[in-house]
Amino acid sequence: MGRFQKALDDPRAAIAWAFRKTQHMWSDEQYLKILYRLFYGRKLNRKSPVTYSEKMQWLKLYHRQTVFTRMVDKYEVKKIVSEKIGSDYVIPCYGVWDSFDEIEFDKLPNQFCLKCTHDSGSFVICKDKKMFDKAAAKARLEHNLYKNFFYEFREWPYKDVKPRIIAEKYEPSLGNADSEE
């Protein structure tokens, strides 16, 4: 009943959800125009964008550089930052793998953070390997390995990022350390 009630309360959100289910059928321009109207209730001004949101849509459509793909990849961007300003500004990486099953947990320290390289928000923090729930971590990360972040909002730099998992040094001072365990 919860989803049905949400759809009744906010029909635009229900339409947006249904629209995203057909996301592969639309050109980038068509998709962004329709999604923009659903979210903001007005037509997207592509020719002379004024608002921040319109300018972001314009950038998605017309400002494409191949280096952006390396910049959104959490593993590849470490190389760029190291080359440009030095490795002191990069959180140390313990490894990169194509699947969860390839991770060599015995070689990782007691505390670490696992992240997907190709999206935003898919991470798992391990504060103690003895208490680490590998099954839950695997379910969360592998679910996200099969998503292509590009399709939801047409942020094309994400389209060709190879989905992988990295292990990084756990840095509790960065952000909310208790948000995922």
Language-model features: locations:
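Acidic/histidine-enriched active-site and ligand-binding environments that engage anionic O-linkages
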Residues: I103-L114
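Catalytic phosphate/metal-binding cores of nucleic-acid and nucleotide-processing enzymes, i.e., regions
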Residues: Y94-D98
